Structure formats: structure tokens, C-alpha cells
């Protein structure tokens, strides 16, 4: 090129390499579209894991009574409820396991055992760890089987409120390190119509041919504390759930032996990987409670204390069983119950009701009931959470 030659610069064409840049641009656009699709379609998870105000719940009437109300680090529905699971007769479990690469339920696995009107069902804790809430129906009763792994607490409720069954989910929030659920009200309430821009929603009873279709107004959900069995915020704040009696946590071997006609729930297809990854065994073995506790009772401040019915000073994570009958409560450690009920049934009285404890060792497994078939409330949990929810100021 001479001094008088035109200034010719190389140009990038599609064939000479421009296709690489074009492809990169398309990939960037696809990634951005994927990243924002959930937001644009309203599917972005609610809750940033840190601030309770980001979870989309009405907290204007929040009732914690001194308890520590915090975010769990996970968004709402990070653990999704298991709704109306498939079930298998318990006596078929051996054959079911034989078809699997990894066995589903074995003899030493812990389960939540529920019995209603002569029908029994087991909910393995490995499944509960990845769902925390199971919306089910047993013997015609709609129930919510709930498990808070941080507290090792299992409670089962009749999920009807004002005669209507609710669906419960995992809010991603905690009260004194305990599970806080929410009701999926929008799925079960009646549609409402708005008569004007300023009018309050009214129930849509009928619609004439010349009327517009009703406008669906999704009502706000309420928050429910597992240990309190009560709504702590939202439209039905202060409402309590009916606790299903005679619920036990024991080994699958123990439950099947005492309930030979039991069923057992089956996991969702996608649960297998999560069940392998999610384990609380290390957490339960160390002494630290990971989330803050706002209330801590002494034996003198516990609700319904009676002489010799409350253990003395214990580690926060000591497994206990709270037995409530006749207006009184007795709390025993899992170890004591396992030791005293192993060779022969351990019998004592709570609130005038004869209680019988039958246990197995290695691993410790305990079944608690009343010898005269009186319904009793049995609450297996860790000691710290029982204290937190049974002070005079706790929601109850």
C-alpha cells in the first residue's frame, strides 16, 4: 500500500467469524430471558431469606409474644408441601424395596405414625425432611402432617377451619426456630366480585346473563405456628387448629409390628435426590440451636407444670415427649421412656388418664398411648422448643 492508496480496513462478515458474535448475542438474550421469565410471569420466589417483610405476608397483626420471628434463609415454598401422596400397604414394603436401587424405608427409619378411626398411616421422616408439610386425608379426615426438622417436632392437625379444609405450605419463616406454615387460601375460598372501585369484596352468589364475570380476589394467607397450632398473623389470626391425638414418632419396624394394617406414603418421583442430600443428623448431634430463641422457660414458668412432671435442667436439644391428658402435661425424655418401657410397659397417670409407654432400644423407639383408649396429645420434640412455646407469654 502506497501513501496515496485508499485506507482499506478489514471488515468482519458473517462468514469470516461474525456468526460467533451473533451466536453469543443470541445466547446472552436467551439467558436474560430465562433469568427474568419468572419475574415477568409472577413466578419469582417470595422471600429473600433475610427479611421477613419480603415474604409477601400481612404482618400487621403478627403475634409472637416475645418469640424470635425470623427468615430461615430459604424463600417461601423452598420446601414444597406434599399434597395427597400415594400410599402403599405396609406389608408390601419389602417387595417395593426389592425393586429399588436404594431402599425407601427400612426397619430403623423413623416415621410419624397416625391413627384415625382404626385406619393408620406412616409418614417417613426422610420424606418429611424435604417437604415438612403433607396435606392428606385419612379415614375421611383432612389432615396436615407437619414436621419441623430444626426442632424434631411432629404434630398432626385437622386442617379444617370453619368447616372448610385448607391446604398448608411452608412459609420459609421461623418462630423460635420452629416451622411456620401458611394457608393457601386462594385455592379454597369462594370467588368474590367488586361492585365498584371503592366497594369491598362481596361473595358472588349468582350472575345474570348481562352481568360481567366475577373478578377473582385472592385473599391474603395467614401464618400458622406449628408448635402453637395457631394462626399468628393474617386474616384468621388467633384461630387454632385441632391437634390429632395419639400421634407418635417411632421406627418403621415398631410401627408396622403394632399396626400391621398400616399404610405408608410414597415420595414424589423427584424426591429421591433431595432425600439423599438433605439430612439433619449432624445438626441434631451438636448442641447449638442455629436460629434465635426469644423465649426460654424454667420449670416454674412452664404452662401446666405439675410436681415430678417436668424434667430439670437439660440440654436444649434433648429429645423429649410431652404427654397431655386431663388438662395436665408430663414431659419425659426419649431416653428415659426407651429405658423404662423396654422390658415391660411403663405405666403412669397424667391428668387422671392411665398412660402406657412401650419401647424398643437400638435405636430408641417409643409408642405412647392410654391404656383405657382415652385420646391424648403426644408431642415429640426437642426440649428447647417445648420450653419456648410453653411459657405464660407464648401463643397458645
Name each region found by the language model.
Residues 6-396:
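Mid-to-C-terminal functional-domain signal that highlights helix-capping/loop sites
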Residues 1-4:
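N-terminal targeting leaders characterized by basic, low-complexity, disordered sequences
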Amino acid at each position: 500500500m502506497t501513501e496515496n492508496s485508499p485506507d482499506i480496513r478489514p471488515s468482519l462478515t458473517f462468514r469470516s467469524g461474525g456468526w460467533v458474535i451473533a451466536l453469543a448475542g443470541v445466547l446472552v438474550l436467551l439467558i436474560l430471558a430465562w433469568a427474568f421469565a419468572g419475574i415477568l410471569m409472577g413466578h419469582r420466589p417470595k422471600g429473600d431469606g433475610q427479611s421477613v417483610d419480603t415474604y409477601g405476608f400481612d404482618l400487621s397483626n403478627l403475634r409472637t409474644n416475645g418469640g424470635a420471628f425470623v427468615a430461615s434463609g430459604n424463600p417461601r415454598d423452598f420446601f414444597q408441601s406434599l399434597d395427597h401422596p400415594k400410599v402403599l400397604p405396609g406389608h408390601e414394603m419389602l417387595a417395593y424395596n426389592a425393586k429399588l436401587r436404594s431402599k425407601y424405608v427400612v426397619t430403623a427409619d423413623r416415621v410419624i405414625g397416625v391413627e384415625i378411626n382404626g385406619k393408620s398411616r406412616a409418614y417417613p421422616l426422610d420424606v418429611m425432611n424435604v417437604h415438612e408439610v403433607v396435606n392428606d386425608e385419612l379415614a375421611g379426615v383432612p389432615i396436615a402432617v407437619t414436621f419441623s426438622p430444626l426442632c424434631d417436632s411432629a404434630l398432626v392437625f385437622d386442617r379444617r377451619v370453619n368447616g372448610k379444609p385448607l391446604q398448608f405450605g411452608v412459609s420459609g419463616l421461623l418462630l423460635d426456630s420452629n416451622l411456620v406454615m401458611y394457608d393457601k387460601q386462594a385455592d379454597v375460598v369462594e370467588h368474590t366480585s367488586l361492585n365498584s372501585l371503592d366497594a369491598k369484596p362481596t361473595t358472588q352468589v349468582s350472575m345474570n346473563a348481562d352481568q360481567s364475570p366475577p373478578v377473582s380476589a385472592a385473599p391474603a394467607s395467614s401464618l400458622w405456628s406449628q408448635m402453637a397450632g395457631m394462626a399468628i398473623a393474617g386474616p384468621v389470626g388467633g384461630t387454632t387448629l385441632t391437634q390429632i391425638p395419639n400421634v407418635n414418632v417411632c421406627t418403621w419396624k415398631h410401627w408396622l409390628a403394632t399396626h400391621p394394617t398400616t399404610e405408608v406414603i410414597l415420595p414424589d418421583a423427584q424426591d429421591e435426590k433431595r432425600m439423599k442430600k438433605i439430612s439433619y443428623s449432624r445438626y441434631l448431634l451438636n448442641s447449638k440451636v442455629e436460629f434465635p430463641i426469644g423465649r426460654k422457660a424454667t420449670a416454674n414458668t412452664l404452662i401446666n407444670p405439675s410436681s415430678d412432671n417436668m424434667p430439670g435442667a437439660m440440654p436444649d436439644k434433648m429429645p423429649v415427649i410431652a404427654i397431655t391428658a386431663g388438662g395436665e402435661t408430663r414431659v419425659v425424655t426419649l431416653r428415659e421412656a426407651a429405658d423404662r418401657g423396654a422390658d415391660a410397659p411403663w405405666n403412669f397417670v397424667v391428668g387422671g388418664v392411665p398412660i402406657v409407654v412401650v419401647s424398643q432400644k437400638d435405636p430408641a423407639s417409643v409408642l405412647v398411648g392410654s391404656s383405657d383408649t382415652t385420646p391424648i396429645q403426644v408431642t415429640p420434640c426437642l426440649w428447647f422448643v417445648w420450653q419456648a412455646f410453653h411459657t405464660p407469654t407464648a401463643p397458645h
